[in-house]
């Protein structure tokens, strides 16, 4: 991570940290690094956004910056992040830009870039943009007169993306009753249209954005209302998306949450059965549940773990030519179809498995036994010392011996805060909590803020 770019683009409180001035510079410098210096006089750039009230302000500034470098900008309007990634690739654009802070509160916003291949930027590309941001007045081209180009609206891009998604499944969803939660974000109109077009009987919540209510007690980070609605309407299942549509969480017919691990298992199992799973491998992060790995083992499916963050999952998938990966939080990447986590794509693939197998979501998810998990955050003076602390290693070894293979420990420094995260999975809730507390107590005693 650099001074401006985090793990998922540039983010901050809109108009305070992520200002229109910064958005202009990101458009100008990002457009130069990623498009103009390839030799294109008028590189094509696609720009999309979510439903946040600050989106229009940042969009205007960003587009001004892009046009100032000579870019030909096509404004997509409200669309999902994976929609921008797909269209950038499909339409042969040099660059795609999404204005969104994903599952964050409405006050935040962000800007993330996609290269012409539909993938997020490399560290090297981000560093090149950051170097320009830190210069006072970098000498860059400034077209004048007839060399300045108009921007255009391409709102039908969303429909093009939905038509593509529809083509990835071989069945319709007639007879399935599905509740959709759009998080009052990018998928608020996309999801009902897509599932309706596939002949599902749909109910919706969180699909009435007003610019201020994105992710507010709805969507994939707040699936409680969805669970209630599924049970109340006697629906087959529910799907909750996040603000920019790159992640998904499901709810079964009984109102039970089905997370990213379970969704990956269900889809991966079907792909494996149909000999469509590259190298019989699913890529996940270290936060995936132990039950996920045990279930995969029983199916003869291999797994590969990365650091937390969908960008690391994608990097590993590209390295090994794997076509399914994701996170427990609901970022699921299906590389045969798109280059980033895609909630709508994952949702219709999951619905397709349910329709084709004739099994309920609870039956499919029940094949993976989730181990109870306890997570404790400990505030420390130097979070990176945890990896070499002898006392912490000692208590971890002791707990592992006691669990005798029926559990898992993960102790890691937080990526964003001065914390050590202690996560334990065990056979029972009581064991998970007890073991996590034992380890957290040692971390606190040896590394806490008062040390």
From Swiss-Prot:
Catalytic activity: alpha-D-glucosamine 1-phosphate = D-glucosamine 6-phosphate
GO cellular component terms given for this protein: cytosol
Enzyme class of the recorded protein, top EC level: isomerase
Source domain of life: Bacteria
The protein's Enzyme Commission number: 5.4.2.10
GO biological processes: carbohydrate metabolic process; peptidoglycan biosynthetic process; UDP-N-acetylglucosamine biosynthetic process
SUPFAM superfamilies with a match to the protein in the record: Phosphoglucomutase, C-terminal domain (SSF55957), Phosphoglucomutase, first 3 domains (SSF53738)
Signal peptide per UniProt: none
Chain positions found as Phosphoserine: 102
Active site: 102
Sequence similarity: Belongs to the phosphohexose mutase family.
General function of this protein: Catalyzes the conversion of glucosamine-6-phosphate to glucosamine-1-phosphate.
HAMAP family listed in its UniProt record: GlmM_B (MF_01554_B)
Protein name, entry field: Phosphoglucosamine mutase
Taxonomic lineage of the native organism: Bacteria, Bacillati, Bacillota, Bacilli, Bacillales
């Amino acid at each position: 991570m650099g001074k401006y770019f985090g793990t998922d683009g540039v983010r901050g409180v809109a108009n305070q940290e992520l200002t229109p001035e910064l958005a202009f510079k990101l458009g100008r410098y990002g457009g130069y690094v990623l498009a103009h210096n390839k030799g294109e006089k008028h590189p094509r750039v696609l720009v999309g956004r979510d439903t946040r009230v600050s989106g229009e302000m940042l969009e205007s500034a960003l587009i001004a910056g892009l046009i100032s470098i000579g870019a030909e900008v096509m404004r997509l309007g409200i669309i999902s992040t994976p929609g921008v990634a797909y269209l950038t690739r499909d339409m042969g654009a040099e660059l795609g830009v999404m204005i969104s802070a994903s599952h964050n509160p409405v006050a935040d916003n962000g800007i993330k870039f996609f290269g012409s291949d539909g993938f997020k930027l490399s560290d090297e590309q981000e560093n090149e943009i950051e170097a320009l941001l830190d210069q006072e007045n970098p000498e860059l081209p400034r077209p004048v007169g007839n060399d300045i180009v108009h921007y255009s609206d391409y709102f039908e891009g969303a429909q093009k993306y939905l038509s593509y998604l529809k083509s990835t499944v071989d069945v319709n969803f007639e007879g399935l009753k599905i509740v959709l939660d759009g998080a009052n974000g990018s998928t608020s109109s996309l999801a009902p249209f897509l599932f309706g077009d596939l002949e599902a009987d749909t109910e919706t919540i969180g699909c009435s954005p007003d610019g201020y209510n994105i992710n507010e007690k709805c969507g994939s980070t707040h699936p409680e209302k969805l669970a209630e609605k599924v049970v109340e309407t006697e629906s087959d299942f529910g799907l909750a998306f996040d603000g920019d549509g790159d992640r998904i969480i499901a709810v079964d017919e009984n109102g039970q949450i089905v997370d990213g691990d379970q969704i990956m298992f269900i889809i991966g199992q079907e792909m494996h059965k149909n000999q469509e799973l590259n190298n019989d491998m699913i890529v996940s992060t270290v936060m995936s549940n132990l039950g996920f790995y045990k279930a995969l083992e029983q199916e003869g499916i291999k797994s590969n773990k990365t650091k937390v963050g969908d960008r690391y999952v994608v990097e590993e998938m590209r390295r090994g030519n794997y076509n399914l990966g994701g996170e427990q939080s609901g970022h699921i990447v299906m590389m045969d179809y798109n280059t980033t986590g895609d909630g709508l794509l994952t949702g219709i693939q999951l619905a397709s498995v349910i329709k084709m197998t004739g099994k309920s979501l609870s039956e499919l998810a029940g094949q993976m036994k989730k181990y109870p998990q306890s997570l404790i955050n400990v505030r420390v003076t130097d979070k990176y010392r945890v990896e070499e602390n002898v006392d912490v290693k000692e208590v971890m070894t002791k707990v592992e011996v006691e669990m005798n293979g029926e559990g898992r420990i993960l102790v890691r420094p937080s990526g964003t805060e001065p914390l050590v995260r202690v996560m334990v999975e065990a056979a029972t809730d009581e064991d998970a909590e007890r073991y996590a507390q034992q380890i957290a107590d040692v971390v606190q005693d040896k590394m806490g803020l008062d040390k």
